[in-house]
Amino acid sequence: MNAKVLEKKFIVPFVLITSLFALWGFANDITNPMVAVFQTVMEIPASEAALVQLAFYGGYGTMAIPAALFASRYSYKAGILLGLALYAIGAFLFWPAAQYEIFNFFLVSLYILTFGLAFLETTANPYILAMGDPQTATRRLNFAQSFNPLGSITGMFVASQLVLTNLESDKRDAAGNLIFHTLSEAEKMSIRTHDLAEIRDPYIALGFVVVAVFIIIGLKKMPAVKIEEAGQISFKTAVSRLAQKAKYREGVIAQAFYVGVQIMCWTFIVQYAERLGFTKAEGQNFNIIAMAIFISSRFISTALMKYLKAEFMLMLFAIGGFLSILGVIFIDGVWGLYCLILTSGFMPLMFPTIYGIALYGLKEESTLGAAGLVMAIVGGALMPPLQGMIIDQGEVMGLPAVNFSFILPLICFVVIAIYGFRAWKILK
């Protein structure tokens, strides 16, 4: 008899925890296009603007292990509530950041916001895995993760329709060139104040939504799911055991490269489109199309897992991503942009599948193992500034630098494909 993906007693808690996946998806994807916005309005190079992503995902690296230790000592619910509190604080800090018009203040706000996201991901992912039979854990997490892109596409839509379309700094002349850099300092200051307020407002609204979710989960009685390692093994012992498990160890590496490819493809699609003459808002609309493909592929790939091994599908989809990125690099013009959009169709199963493969069979070390996989996110955050540095070159090896910069996602897909193959055929 096949094990159920989700038992009836877990439905309401599952729905509440799954809503968190949409919340961090929203934060991720309203933030991605802000790299291009800060680059223009603060008049900084792409490499410096990409520090937005380093700050955003750096919070994961800082807080993943503390979040795991906190959840182990108290409970998954306590970890989730603390995560929501930090999330709200970071969002509300956008108000003073916009008032003072300091780029580094925005970075600090994002850094604190992602302290909260680290708590949420470190606790919500293993909580979902624990809500039922271990045999269906990866399918259950893939299903829960299916709602993450719903938050993502909402964040993209808000960025496109409520922020990017209202930016004074993105006004162009008849030839399609930005005019912001040609204005007087007084005009720039006025526009900067206006545009930073446009950036600020969605984050403030988001803060209030997070507070509401905090109250709902705080008042709801959640099922007690045992956290195996609490009080049983030391931190050092858990780390030692994890380091000896090749499937886990290599999974952390693969996860870092997956996060890198996701951030780079969804952040720099705007710059790729701008080089072709599109506005930031139009570039973000292409990102929304990519996310729609991502969502559709998520549900399709989750259904296919009933018939195909997760490890095999991971390898297959990584090869597809590799081929589409080749088009991004070597096909100039709008067809290269279409290849970049298509790449999103190969990405949706990767994060939860790597997560499920790496954690499968772990017991006492499961929460700390989850923290290690969340920490891997910061590894991916190191890649966007490097891609920004390539873009700043203008041209590399006869190719537009923005095209050539996608050699980094190309390498990422190679690493993921190798992990999928090894997990399928070699690692036990």
Swiss-Prot record:
Q: Give TM regions.
A: 10-30, 51-71, 78-98, 100-120, 147-167, 204-224, 250-270, 288-308, 311-331, 339-359, 371-391, 401-421
The entry's keywords: Carbohydrate metabolism, Cell inner membrane, Cell membrane, Fucose metabolism, Membrane, Sugar transport, Transmembrane, Transmembrane helix, Transport
Q: Which Pfam families match?
A: MFS_1
UniProt-listed GO biological process terms: fucose metabolic process
Q: Where in the cell is it found?
A: Cell inner membrane
The protein's job, in short, is: Mediates the uptake of L-fucose across the boundary membrane with the concomitant transport of protons into the cell (symport system).
Question: Under which name does UniProt file this protein?
Answer: L-fucose-proton symporter
Tell me the name of the encoding gene.
fucP
